[in-house]
Amino acid sequence: MWSGDRRVGMESLSPERLHGHPYQEEASVFCRLTVKILEARSLPRADLLSQADPYVTVQLPTASGMKFKTQTVTNSSHPVWNETFSFLIQSQVKNILELTIYDEDVITKDDICFKVSYDVSEILPGQLLQKTFSLNPQGPEELDVELLMERTWDPPENLITNNVLVARELSHLDVSLDRAGNTAMAAGQDKLELELMLKGSYEDTQTFFPDTAFTFSFHYMRGQDTELNGYLRGPRNSGWNSDTSVTPFNVPLMSLAAGKEMTIDIPAMKAPEGKLQLKTDCCPKELSVRLSYGLCPEEQAFLSRRKKVVAAALKQALQLDEDLNEDEVPVVGINAEGGGMRAMISLYGHLLALQKLGLLDCVTYFSGISGSTWTMAHLYRDPEWSQRDLEGPISHAREHVAKTLLKEFLPEHLASYRQTLKLREEQGYTVTVADLWGLVLESKLHGQVTDQKLSGQRAALERGQNPLPLYLSLNVKENHLETLHFKEWVEFSPYEVGFLKYGGFVPSELFGSEFFMGRLMKRLPESQICFLEGIWSNLFSVNLMDIWYDITYGKDSNNFPVDVRNSEKEFSGSAGTSSGVEAPWLESGTALAQALKGFLTGRPFHQRSANFLHGLQLHRDYCNQRHFSTWADCNLDDTPNQLTPQDPQLCLIDAGCFMNSSCPSLFRPGRQVDLIISFNYNQSLPFKGLQQSEKYSRARGLPFPRVEPSPEDHSQPQECYLFSDPTCPEAPVVLHFPLVNDSFRDHSAPGVRRSPDELKAGQVNLTGAASPYFMYNMTYKNEDFDRLLQLSDYNVQNNQGTILQALRTVLKRRASETRPLGVKT
């Protein structure tokens, strides 16, 4: 509860951060949808002794934040309502009407009997449609509804869209209390609370003490057909009317003229009437969220700088006679898989080898997930890391990896974590176990918590001196779906953070801040990168259903469920029961079924961040856009009212919980990666991540070479594989390095056989029962660290010829062919 000035103004970005928004602006008219709930038939009994006591709720989230309700018809299986509700709708967004039949219960929570979703775009303007919904495909239950669509004379609304997401015009309502001449209140009423609600607004509900003057704001859609509701309440522990509201009041927002003040009275029993002053006005139309599937201007500028570095490195590595033109420079990307500390150490070895071979400067993109991000985040603390000897950061890692993880939970460390988390909470963040995990990681890997930020890594890109780092995470549903049934890639780079699926991005320093309808509402201090590492490598965020799927399908990449629906299919949620997204055995609305479902799909250790897409709506044709592909195993993609823009917070987890690959970042339009260097860190499944990437790519219509290792390759993998498709020049060439100990057993360096005294150093136990390299081991002896590092270093150096061959192949392609633009991802 607040008193005083509480106006929340939208934050603004510097002009340079507002450039590069290739979205479309279009004026779109409003329509008026009238919904008349007529009657239902053959509703089931509530119990053995009586019929149901049904009522219907009517909701259209894209038009109003309010949920309307019919009267309850008692003890009836054939209730008749004949009640009418009205919505002002925007015709260019996906409007899904939700009708839910409840059985009212005086003692327990009302039960949901049936739920229907209907796409109102099927109704033509001027058409009166009577619709009968079958509530149960196997039963006689039905609901009759009358629907009327009419054009209105309201001024058209200017929309901003990338044809998937839509940002609508925003208004702000300023509310202030005028207490002139009413300085005294009746006895016992000086502690009254004034609660104001504007459903569908950014603020939703605000509560104040009316004994002092105050000013505050609500931010809401200009075309939102809703009202401001107010309640004057007595404190619960007082005797003054404590159990009821005092004469609730409401103000339809459509009655307020923009820019003009309105004064209304607050009814108060036994007290002088206070007066509320209301004034509404338009918000600036500029967005803080970039709506585009293309690359941001900062990345495009980086590419131009980096190509000069890559061109010089390729000329030297391939002994070219002439300099390369910018359009002849191939794009090389690293795909670093996850694998905990094992992945971190191995990646150091792989990068060290590329540096020794003079090939690290040939890389443009450096993508990683899970444990690989620990290496990446450490290296990019130094803006010149790839130009310096990597032995420095490797020695740092060796020193800290040798420490036991238990030391990070000593009392002095716990006190430090508590203080840091308290400060984070005071800054406005929601603190979770994942944040604590990030602090433990930071202390383990670096000995202290530092103030490094993701945006600070831009210094490492200013001259194109390093590859662009890309960190990948997954957004999932918090409690009611397993990862396989709903997952969305979220990409983090020093420039921006965003969803590959929706084409919505924000500057990296604004991740965690609060947004509404594409506008920055509340800016929070940028998170330290350790908290992001807590997201990127949080394997504890899986739920029991994820573990079950991993046990069932983990060893068979062919069963990996990444199929994508035909994006041209029509919206599938026109009418039906519920959302259709749960497994049948979890669909029951009983308390026991819901409790079991929550137990199996709950994520107690996930990270929660403010959703920067919150409030944005989906375009009426979003499902037909080539960049938006729906998953074959996820009906939720066809249910816009349940997609991410409707959620106030994100639920972010380790991307390795779904697919142990960072390739989706390399598939984005505009990146046009020619060569992928794939580093595998799986102990027993050397091709799983790459085969998942291939299946994912093909399901989305992306060119990708066939990854078809033989049974012998699975059981005894080689050090390096080259996969390409000569018949499809658009497909990238892939170099794949499994984590394997092959010729390193008897070679200390490429072409140098080990002496008898050196053979022990070549024995690296990667998969045995006594292997120190298992996933959850966080402490390595120096000897084990060095063997894994040297093995990874050797495997890359020993295949220098294959790497150079791949570089020549993609260089030849670049020189002889023009790459098509706008490749679908």
Swiss-Prot record:
User: What PROSITE patterns does this protein's entry cite?
Assistant: C2, PLA2C
What is the uppermost EC class here? hydrolase
Kindly list the residue ranges recorded as spanning the membrane. Answer: none
- The EC number(s) attached to this protein equal 3.1.1.4
Q: Which reaction does it catalyse?
A: a 1,2-diacyl-sn-glycero-3-phosphocholine + H2O = a 1-acyl-sn-glycero-3-phosphocholine + a fatty acid + H(+); 1-hexadecanoyl-2-(5Z,8Z,11Z,14Z-eicosatetraenoyl)-sn-glycero-3-phosphocholine + H2O = 1-hexadecanoyl-sn-glycero-3-phosphocholine + (5Z,8Z,11Z,14Z)-eicosatetraenoate + H(+); 1-hexadecanoyl-2-(9Z,12Z-octadecadienoyl)-sn-glycero-3-phosphocholine + H2O = (9Z,12Z)-octadecadienoate + 1-hexadecanoyl-sn-glycero-3-phosphocholine + H(+); 1-hexadecanoyl-2-(9Z-octadecenoyl)-sn-glycero-3-phosphocholine + H2O = 1-hexadecanoyl-sn-glycero-3-phosphocholine + (9Z)-octadecenoate + H(+)
Record-annotated residues binding Ca(2+) 1?
47, 53, 103, 105
Q: Which Pfam families match?
A: C2 (PF00168), cPLA2_C2 (PF18695), PLA2_B (PF01735)
Report how it sits in the membrane: Peripheral membrane protein
Give the Gene3D superfamilies listed for this entry: C2 domain, Cytosolic phospholipase A2 catalytic domain
Question: What does the record say about activity regulation?
Answer: Stimulated by cytosolic Ca(2+).
What this protein needs as a cofactor is: Ca(2+)
Where is it found, in Gene Ontology cellular component terms? cytoplasm; cytosol; membrane
Q: What is the reported tissue distribution?
A: Weakly or not expressed in most tissues. Detected in placenta of 17.5 dpc embryos.
Comment block on domains = The N-terminal C2 domain mediates the association with lipid membranes upon calcium binding. An additional second C2 domain may stand in between the C2 domain and the PLA2c domain.
Q: Which PANTHER family match?
A: CYTOSOLIC PHOSPHOLIPASE A2 (PTHR10728), CYTOSOLIC PHOSPHOLIPASE A2 DELTA (PTHR10728:SF31)
Describe its function: Calcium-dependent phospholipase A2 that selectively hydrolyzes glycerophospholipids in the sn-2 position. Compared to its human ortholog, may have no preference for the fatty acid found at the sn-2 position.
What is the protein's given name? Answer: Cytosolic phospholipase A2 delta
